[in-house]
Amino acid sequence: MSKTVKVAVTGAAGQIGYSLLFRIASGQMFGADTAVEIQMLELEAAIPAAKGVIMELEDCAFPLLQKVTVSSDLDTAFKEINWALLVGSVPRKAGMERGDLLKINGGIFVNQGKAIEKNAASDVRILVVGNPCNTNCLIAMNNAKGISQDRWFAMTKLDENRAKSQLASKAGVPVKEVTHLGIWGNHSATQYPDFYNTKISGKPVTDVISDHEWLKGDFIKNVQQRGAEIIKARGASSAASAANGVVDTVRGIITPTAPGDCFSAAVVSDGSYGAEKGLIFGFPLKSDGKKVEIIQGISLNDFAKEKFKITHEELVSERNEVKEML
């Protein structure tokens, strides 16, 4: 066993947390040669439930799981961590305006950013999952200015996986045949799943799927609205698929990307493709296993540019609503 990774998981007793913790402990996130210590952060009221999850983790006797703890104290939960998986956030309730949600969650992520900066290991990386994840990530990052901006990520991999599944189903091929699929912008109903640059079995999607109206219409809408569809169907938001997106994102960051392929996450914009510098914006990315880069030179046609503009405007608007927290 080569090393031990300390991972903080916030909102650990929630649905996504429950699906995620066992996958971390089993080695699916960091690999079969990496031991893990899990430090759960939960609200005081949820500590008993979290302790029940700890009992279950213990009962799995995972060889890689060295230690698991739970705390409601930020300093304790983030002590010397190498990874922070910020899953917990306040969900939008009936009658709640989006601006209210941004501000309520903003306060949470201000404090978490400060606590991570104060307590985490020098090599910490942070993945924000709790929605609205792009702007929550922006807030936390701006309250932890001592941590390099290239260590902050927000999750769009679930959207990428949803898009791949839709395209594979339409083309009648296994999902592994779908590659080069990037998600641009916000993890919201404005995101743009970039089918024009996606490949199916190495060929452009537009050559394989002849129904271009479906691609430009229902395909994008299906990906954008998938979360709402799942809530309608099961009476709760997607949890196992979101947890899978977290695992896939971390794997994408720490594993070299296959030549010519990409993976999706939101990172701090350096101005690439005209996305405003400093925004947390979804891009197609590549990794060498250590450093993550925005893939350059991707061609965006007029259709794509229009979609890009819509999601970019939404992220600028969200940023402006929480300016006093940055």
From Swiss-Prot:
It catalyses: (S)-malate + NAD(+) = oxaloacetate + NADH + H(+). The keyword Lyase does not apply. Pfam families: Ldh_1_C, Ldh_1_N. Keywords: NAD, Oxidoreductase, Tricarboxylic acid cycle. Substrate binds at residues 92, 98, 131, 162. Its EC number is 1.1.1.37. GO terms for molecular function: L-malate dehydrogenase (NAD+) activity. NAD(+) binds at residues 11-17, 105, 112, 129-131. It is an enzyme of class 1 (oxidoreductase). The active site is at residue 187. Disulfide bonds: none annotated. InterPro entries: L-lactate/malate_DH, Lactate/malate_DH_C, Lactate/malate_DH_N, Lactate_DH/Glyco_Ohase_4_C, Malate_DH_AS, Malate_DH_type2, NAD(P)-bd_dom_sf. One of its GO terms (biological process) is oxaloacetate metabolic process. The keyword Oxidoreductase applies. Catalyzes the reversible oxidation of malate to oxaloacetate. Belongs to the LDH/MDH superfamily. MDH type 2 family. PANTHER family: MALATE DEHYDROGENASE (PTHR23382). This is Malate dehydrogenase. It comes from Leptospira interrogans serogroup Icterohaemorrhagiae serovar Lai (strain 56601). The gene is mdh.
